Amino acid sequence: MPIVFVHGVNNRDGEAYRENEAGRNGFLREIVAPALGLKPDKLRIFSPYWGKFGVEFAWNMAVLPNPGDGFESFGGNAESEALGRVVGLLAESQATGHVVVDAQQDFPATVDLLYASAMAGAKSEDEARDLARSYMLCAEYADKNPQPDWVATATPDNFADQLNYVAEASQEESFGAGGILDSLKEGLSRLVNAAPDATTALAGSLLRKKLNTTVTRFAGDAFVYLARRGTKDAPGAIVKTVLDALRNAQAARTADDDKLVVIAHSFGGEIMYDILTHFDPTIQLDGLITVGSQVGLFEEMKLYLASRPNLPPDPPAGHIARPPSVARWFNVFDTNDVLSYRLEPVVNGVSDFHYDTGFSSLSAHGGYFMRPSFYKRMAARLSGG
């Protein structure tokens, strides 16, 4: 089952983009693929990168408020970036970052938080895959033991060791403690270090600037796409990049593995809808998952090439039809994500699902694929659960 991941706005090539891709691919292989009856190494993943054709700012967004302050960051190296993501994870959330206290309140949620923190620093797909396998063991243990006795006497120094020990002791298979335990301890360290920063004015300022930048680039990427998407005979660069990946994924189908699934984040959903309704309606999808997307909003504004002002004739009671080439369509949103929208009120044959990323409104839009539990839920939906 080839999977095509279509990224959204505000993605530009660099270390953070490549680390996010590696982490995402690792969790898709180790959590989603087995649920679909595939061996992890057999899963073909296509990730068309269209960000290079997105908006460019002549003055580097100098029009944003307080440009003289510069764009503060948590640091230029990878670990500082990972810590910044964890600060965003904790800011305005119910978690405190004090892992033992959090575990005593909600052990399964704390396990997910710990692995999200570890995943934030994954540097390769292999490391992400190891984390994903370990997460599945620990998540299963947490589901069966939501209030384990050992948490009452655990300390921040031994929490990761005890979690790793009890999770593996409950399974016949062990994935090895060495590298995983180190990654978990790094994740726990990020939580401890991020906890004080998550409540400071500096964190709020940084996250607001991040949101401001995201919204600005969202508008810019959207305007560029709409102005340059091209025609069916001469598609623009963004459409062509995604279309080529879809056709390559179609060609990768075999008689024994003939399914094709597309995961589209944010504006990737709008690109996919234009492709499926205008540029190439012949592309057959067994599953389409739009995440934090605005597909319904853009149809309400009638901005697609296939949009018709008189269809449906009786909104809001009426709906438009799901593209016939899509067998199943799941639309995932977080009420904290200010850039995510429902789709059921506009399109027939679509299932809306709410997912709580655990992030505040300042960071939720990019948070879905940072949470290990998101892949677990996705696997369950795709496998019919």
Give, region by region, the residue ranges found by the protein language model.
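Conserved, well-structured beta-alpha core segment at the onset of a catalytic domain
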Residues: 1-102, 354-366, 370-385
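Anion-binding catalytic surfaces of enzymes that hydrolyze or transfer phosphate/sulfate esters
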Residues: 200-220, 231-236
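Non-catalytic, alpha-helical, charged scaffold/linker segments
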Residues: 47-209
